[in-house]
């Protein structure tokens, strides 16, 4: 069976809220957990980074007049909350997990240590990485690219909330937006397509990390992407078309 053997799954915080406007939807997070278990049972080694858009948005901090660093740390704490919720949902499926955070939260998680994270993956534990990169001004997309490079993972599965992949323009604003099936990292950078921030895209380019952008809300899509079935979403790589 041809499939990705080792992945970093980047979940947007919004993917956890389902159809709700805020927070964590119990049915949605359970569905995600079972889909992760399904690919775990195929022998795939899995690291996960979760965003916090379901709990905290940077623009809220701006509206409050908050210091950018303070607002970013709130976002990092939100990712830890999401990581713990996902850990619990996964463990209800009898999937062994470890939550590791970029700064110490010793009562609830392990500190992120690269060699220890690699060891967890080798022992077939799902590693959930909280607190982003651990520093303000760096997005969870950048954290995903950084951790993928550190953990020798050559593909990031970027799960989106009801977005099929990368478009030539915003599909929410333009009905004639076209889904791009395959694109180069260089094009993401030069065209400034709204897939991820420039720092994350540059890291992936420099370290030959492919990115697969797909719709998380369609049941079975994670497995299809891992097994390279169905031509789902958008592939971003150094090879292009």
Curated annotation (Swiss-Prot):
- Subunit structure, briefly? Homohexamer.
Residues reported in the UniProt entry to bind UMP: 72, 133-140
Cellular component per GO? cytoplasm
Q: Does the keyword Acetylation apply?
A: no
Q: Tell me, what does this protein do in biology? A: Catalyzes the reversible phosphorylation of UMP to UDP.
User: Where's it mainly located?
Assistant: cytoplasm
Binding residues annotated for ATP, in chain numbering: 10-13, 53, 57, 161, 167, 170
Q: NCBIfam families, per this entry?
A: pyrH_bact
* Family per similarity comment: Belongs to the UMP kinase family.
PANTHER family per the record? URIDYLATE KINASE (PTHR42833), URIDYLATE KINASE PUMPKIN, CHLOROPLASTIC (PTHR42833:SF4)
Q: Name one Pfam family in it.
A: AA_kinase
Q: Please write the reaction equations for the catalytic activity of this protein.
A: UMP + ATP = UDP + ADP
Q: What subcellular locations does the record give?
A: Cytoplasm
What general EC class does the enzyme of this chain belong to?
transferase
Its pathway, per UniProt, is: Pyrimidine metabolism; CTP biosynthesis via de novo pathway; UDP from UMP (UMPK route): step 1/1
Concerning InterPro entries, the annotation shows: AceGlu_kinase-like_sf (IPR036393), Asp/Glu/Uridylate_kinase (IPR001048), Uridylate_kinase (IPR011817), Uridylate_kinase_bac (IPR015963)
Identification of the protein by name = Uridylate kinase
Q: Which Gene Ontology biological process is one annotated for this entry? A: 'de novo' CTP biosynthetic process
E.C. number, please? 2.7.4.22
GO MF term (any one): UMP kinase activity
Q: Name the gene.
A: pyrH
HAMAP family per the record? PyrH_B
* Superkingdom assignment: Bacteria
Q: Which UniProt keywords apply?
A: ATP-binding, Cytoplasm, Kinase, Nucleotide-binding, Pyrimidine biosynthesis, Transferase
| Signal sequence residues | none
């Amino acid at each position: 069976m041809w499939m990705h053997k080792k992945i970093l799954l980047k979940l947007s915080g919004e993917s956890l809220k389902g159809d709700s406007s805020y927070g964590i939807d119990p049915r949605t997070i359970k569905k995600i957990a079972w889909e992760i278990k399904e690919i775990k049972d195929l022998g795939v080694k899995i690291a996960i980074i979760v965003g916090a858009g379901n709990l905290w948005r940077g623009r809220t901090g701006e509206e409050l007049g908050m210091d950018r660093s303070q607002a970013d740390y709130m976002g990092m704490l939100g990712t830890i909350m999401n990581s713990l919720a996902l850990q619990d949902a996964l463990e209800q499926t009898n999937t062994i997990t470890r939550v590791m955070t970029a700064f110490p939260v010793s009562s609830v998680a392990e500190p992120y240590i690269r060699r220890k994270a690699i060891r967890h993956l080798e022992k077939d534990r799902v590693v959930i990485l909280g607190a982003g990169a651990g520093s303000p001004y760096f997005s969870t997309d950048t954290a995903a690219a950084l951790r993928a490079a550190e953990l020798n993972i050559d593909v990031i599965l970027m799960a989106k909330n009801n977005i099929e992949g990368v478009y030539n323009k915003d599909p929410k604003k333009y009905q004639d937006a076209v889904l791009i099936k395959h694109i180069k990292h260089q094009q993401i950078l030069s065209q400034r397509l709204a897939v991820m921030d420039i720092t994350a895209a540059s890291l992936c380019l420099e370290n030959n990390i492919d990115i697969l952008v797909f719709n998380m809300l369609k049941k079975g899509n994670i497995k299809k992407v891992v097994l390279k079935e169905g031509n789902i979403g958008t592939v971003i790589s150094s090879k292009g078309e």
